[in-house]
Amino acid sequence: MSKKIITGKVVSNAMDKTITVETDRLTKHPKYHKFVRKTRRYHAHDENNECEIGDIVEIEESRKLSKTKAFVLKRIVRKNILSEEVETPDSVEEELKEAFGGEVDGTTRE
């Protein structure tokens, strides 16, 4: 029997070596025949803690690793572009101090 491979989005990585992956699927309502979006969350093992929130990943079914964890991270399909390091205001202030050679208090001169 082949192992299930599921593609989804990482919504949490707060636990050590564990990620929460959310998948969406469309199902047709039996009575109203309207498509309804269903969401399912899976816990997966991330050995190297390499996933960030927003990454698109593939997880593979494995033996039960804990009470709720039965999948293992197979690969990261696409990294979240927002997980890149963003320039913080502190680093901008330091660059301004270096550029103008003095104290920067955040006020503008006219």
Curated annotation (Swiss-Prot):
Sequence similarity: Belongs to the universal ribosomal protein uS17 family.
GO biological process per UniProt: translation
Cellular component per GO? Answer: cytosolic small ribosomal subunit
The answer to whether keyword rRNA-binding applies is yes
User: According to its UniProt entry, what is the function of this protein?
Assistant: One of the primary rRNA binding proteins, it binds specifically to the 5'-end of 16S ribosomal RNA.
Q: Output this protein's name.
A: Small ribosomal subunit protein uS17
Q: Which SUPFAM superfamilies match?
A: Nucleic acid-binding proteins
Query: What GO annotations for molecular function exist for this entry?
Result: rRNA binding; structural constituent of ribosome
Quaternary form? Part of the 30S ribosomal subunit.
Identify the keywords attached in UniProt to this record, alphabetized: Ribonucleoprotein, Ribosomal protein, RNA-binding, rRNA-binding
Q: Which InterPro entries match?
A: NA-bd_OB-fold (IPR012340), Ribosomal_uS17 (IPR000266), Ribosomal_uS17_bact/chlr (IPR019984)
Q: Tell me which CDD domains the record gives.
A: Ribosomal_uS17
